[in-house]
């Protein structure tokens, strides 16, 4: 168990610098990467491609976004009331 945690800590990567979002407030960065992940996932699924290429966006938004925001956005996408264009 402790070895698993140590391995996760060793392999953990945070979001890299993105020059589109140079300021300290990363809210827009979080939102954009959430949208980019779901757009990429939708496009790759439609093409029959490998969705794993979208994993970078997922890792970034999981690192930046609060869990409550992500769960709310996921719920709204499921209900069809999500405000973003995916």
Swiss-Prot record:
Motif (Cx9C motif): 30-40
SS bond list: 30-65, 40-54
Pfam families listed in its UniProt record: COX6B
Localization annotation: Mitochondrion inner membrane
Modified residues (N6-acetyllysine): 62
Membrane topology type: Peripheral membrane protein
Residue span, CHCH domain: 27-73
Sequence motif Cx10C motif, location on chain: 54-65
The protein's annotated pathway: Energy metabolism; oxidative phosphorylation
Glycosyltransferase found in the keyword field: no
Sequence positions bearing N-acetylalanine: 2
Main location per the UniProt record: mitochondrion
Family classification: Belongs to the cytochrome c oxidase subunit 6B family.
PANTHER family membership: CYTOCHROME C OXIDASE SUBUNIT 6B
Quaternary organization: Component of the cytochrome c oxidase (complex IV, CIV), a multisubunit enzyme composed of 14 subunits. The complex is composed of a catalytic core of 3 subunits MT-CO1, MT-CO2 and MT-CO3, encoded in the mitochondrial DNA, and 11 supernumerary subunits COX4I1 (or COX4I2), COX5A, COX5B, COX6A2 (or COX6A1), COX6B1 (or COX6B2), COX6C, COX7A1 (or COX7A2), COX7B, COX7C, COX8B and NDUFA4, which are encoded in the nuclear genome.
Name of this chain's protein: Cytochrome c oxidase subunit 6B1
Species annotation: Bos taurus
Gene responsible for this protein: COX6B1
């Amino acid at each position: 168990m402790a070895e698993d945690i140590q391995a996760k800590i060793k392999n953990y990567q945070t979001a890299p610098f993105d020059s589109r979002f140079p300021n300290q407030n990363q809210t827009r960065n979080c939102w954009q990467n959430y949208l980019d992940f779901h757009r990429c996932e939708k496009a790759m699924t439609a093409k029959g491609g490998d969705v794993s290429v979208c994993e970078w966006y997922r890792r970034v938004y999981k690192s930046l976004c609060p869990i409550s925001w992500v769960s709310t956005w996921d719920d709204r996408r499921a209900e069809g009331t999500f405000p973003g264009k995916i």
